[in-house]
Swiss-Prot record:
Entry keyword set: Membrane, Mitochondrion, Mitochondrion outer membrane, Repeat, Transmembrane, Transmembrane helix
Ranges for region Disordered: 77-99
Similarity remark: Belongs to the mitochondrial carrier (TC 2.A.29) family.
Entry's localization field: Mitochondrion outer membrane
Major subcellular site: mitochondrion
Protein's recorded name: Mitochondrial fusion and transport protein ugo1
Gene3D superfamilies on file: Mitochondrial carrier domain
Topological type in the membrane: Multi-pass membrane protein
Compositionally skewed regions (Acidic residues) per UniProt: 87-99
GO CC field: mitochondrial outer membrane; mitochondrion
Organism: Schizosaccharomyces pombe (strain 972 / ATCC 24843) (Fission yeast)
Length: 421
C-alpha cells in the first residue's frame, strides 16, 4: 500500500489486452472457364432445340400470312373463265352482221377501231395484267408452277401437309438455322444495349426489373422499346433472308440474276438458294420501306402491354386478383396488335425486290403500307367468316405459344417453391 495514496489498490495481476479478431469476409467462389462454357453450351442447345421444334409451325404461319387469299369471284376473273363481259352483249359478232344492210355495215365500220390500234391494245394486254381491284400484276404470277402449294383457307395443318408432300422434311424446316441465329443475336444485342443504356442513365435494367416495378417506369419503358427497335433494325437483313428462304421452293432450283435478266438464259449455271447468297444479295442495313413496319412490330405491342398494367396500378391499386386479370387482358391486347403487324411486316419482306430469284411457293399478297395493307386484307382479299379473320392468320400458333409459355412459367415457379421448401 502506498502511504501517500492509500486509496490506490495495487493489482498484482498483469494487465491483459483484448485482441479483437479481424473481420473475415466470405470470399465468393471463383467460376472456372469450364463452368462458363458448360452454361453457354446448355443455353445454345436449349435455344437451338426450341427453334428446331417450333420451326414447322413458324414456316406454316409465315406462308399463311404472306399468301394472297382472293375471293372465288376474283379468282374466276383472274383465270379468265368468264365467257362474256357485260358490254360485249350489245356488239354483234360476224354471224349476226351477215344479215345487216349496207348502211348498218357502214355504221359499225365507222365505230370500229383500226387494226393497228387493236394490235397495240393486244400487245399492251399481254404485257400488263390488271386484276379486278385495279392493281397491275405480273402475268408470270398467274401461272401455276409445279412447286406451288394449294392449301385450304387459313389452315396451318393444310400448309404443313402440302409442304411435306411436295418438299418433304426439308420444306418444314426451311430457315431454321437463320432463325436460330436471328433469335440468338437479337436477344444478346437487345440485352447488351439495354444494360448499357440503363447504366448510362443510372436506372435498373428493364430486362431484370420490370418497368412497372422500376423507380422511373416511363424511362425504363422507353429504354426497353428503343433497344428493341434498334436491335430489330440492325438484324433486319437476317429477318428478310429468313422470309425469302421460307418462301423459296426447295423442289426447284434457280440462279441468282439481276431483275433485268429474263428466264430465257438457260445456259447459265443453276445454283440453289442458300443463306450466304441471300445475305450477299440483301443490303447490310434495313431498307427504307421496312423501317416503319419493323419498328411498329417490335416496339408497339410491348409498349402497350407495359403501359396498361402501369395505368391500372396507378388508378386502381394492386391486388393479386386484379394483377392476374390485368395480365390476362394485357396479353390479349398484345396478341391482337402483334398478329396484324407481323402479317404486314412479312408481306413487306416478301415484296422487297433484290437480286434474288422471284420464285415463291404461294402467290404473294400486296404490300401498300401498314394502313393500305390492312385495308387490302379486309376489303380486297378474303376476310374470313367474321370479317377480320384475314388479319389474324395463324392465330392458333400464337395461342399455342402463349399457352406453352404460361405453362412453363407455372411449372418452373412450382418447382422453385418445392426446392425452397
Amino acid at each position: 500500500m502506498n502511504p501517500y495514496r492509500p486509496y490506490v489498490v495495487v493489482n498484482n495481476v498483469e494487465p491483459t489486452f483484448s485482441i479483437t479478431p479481424e473481420p473475415t469476409f466470405e470470399t465468393q467462389p471463383t467460376i472456372s472457364k469450364s463452368e462458363i462454357f458448360e452454361t453457354l453450351r446448355s443455353i445454345l442447345v436449349t435455344k437451338y432445340l426450341t427453334t428446331f421444334f417450333v420451326q414447322p409451325l413458324e414456316v406454316a404461319k409465315t406462308v399463311c400470312q404472306v399468301e394472297e387469299y382472293l375471293p372465288k369471284r376474283t379468282k374466276i376473273e383472274r383465270d379468265g373463265k368468264q365467257t362474256k363481259e357485260p358490254y360485249d352483249e350489245d356488239i354483234p359478232d360476224g354471224t349476226e352482221q351477215e344479215g345487216l344492210s349496207d348502211d348498218e355495215h357502214e355504221i359499225y365500220a365507222y365505230f370500229e377501231t383500226p387494226t393497228t390500234e387493236k394490235a397495240v391494245t393486244e400487245q399492251l394486254a399481254e404485257k400488263l395484267c390488271v386484276d379486278a381491284s385495279g392493281y397491275v400484276t405480273d402475268p408470270s404470277n398467274l401461272i401455276e408452277r409445279s412447286y406451288t402449294i394449294h392449301s385450304k383457307r387459313f389452315s396451318i395443318k393444310s400448309i404443313i401437309s402440302e409442304l411435306w408432300e411436295k418438299e418433304g422434311a426439308r420444306g418444314l424446316w426451311k430457315g431454321h438455322t437463320i432463325s436460330f441465329l436471328h433469335n440468338l443475336l437479337y436477344s444478346g444485342l437487345q440485352s447488351w444495349l439495354s444494360a448499357t443504356l440503363s447504366g448510362a442513365l443510372a436506372i435498373a435494367d428493364p430486362n431484370i426489373i420490370s418497368p412497372i416495378d422500376s423507380v422511373r417506369p416511363l424511362l425504363s419503358l422507353f429504354i426497353k422499346s428503343i433497344t428493341s427497335a434498334i436491335s430489330a433494325l440492325i438484324l433486319s437483313p437476317l429477318d428478310i433472308a429468313r422470309t425469302k428462304i421460307i418462301l423459296f421452293p426447295i423442289s426447284s432450283s434457280s440462279y441468282l440474276s439481276s431483275a433485268s435478266e429474263t428466264s430465257g438464259n438457260s445456259h447459265k449455271k443453276f445454283k440453289p438458294l442458300t443463306i450466304r447468297q441471300c445475305l450477299k444479295a440483301l443490303p447490310f442495313y434495313c431498307p427504307s420501306s421496312l423501317i416503319l413496319p419493323t419498328v411498329c412490330y417490335v416496339s408497339l405491342p410491348p409498349f402497350v402491354s407495359s403501359v396498361l398494367p402501369l395505368t391500372f396500378r396507378n388508378f386502381l391499386g394492386s391486388s393479386p386478383t386484379l394483377d392476374a386479370m390485368v395480365g390476362l387482358g394485357t396479353s390479349a391486347v398484345q396478341f391482337l396488335l402483334k398478329c396484324p403487324l407481323e402479317m404486314v411486316l412479312r408481306r413487306a419482306q416478301a415484296q422487297y425486290e433484290c437480286n434474288l430469284p422471284p420464285q415463291t411457293i404461294v402467290p404473294v399478297g400486296k404490300y401498300t403500307g401498314i394502313v393500305g395493307t390492312i385495308w387490302c386484307l379486309l376489303s380486297e382479299e378474303d376476310p374470313g367468316k367474321f370479317g377480320i379473320e384475314g388479319l389474324y392468320r395463324g392465330w392458333r400458333v400464337g395461342i399455342w405459344g402463349m399457352s406453352s409459355t404460361l405453362a412453363l412459367n407455372y411449372i418452373s415457379s412450382n418447382l422453385r417453391e418445392e426446392v425452397e421448401f
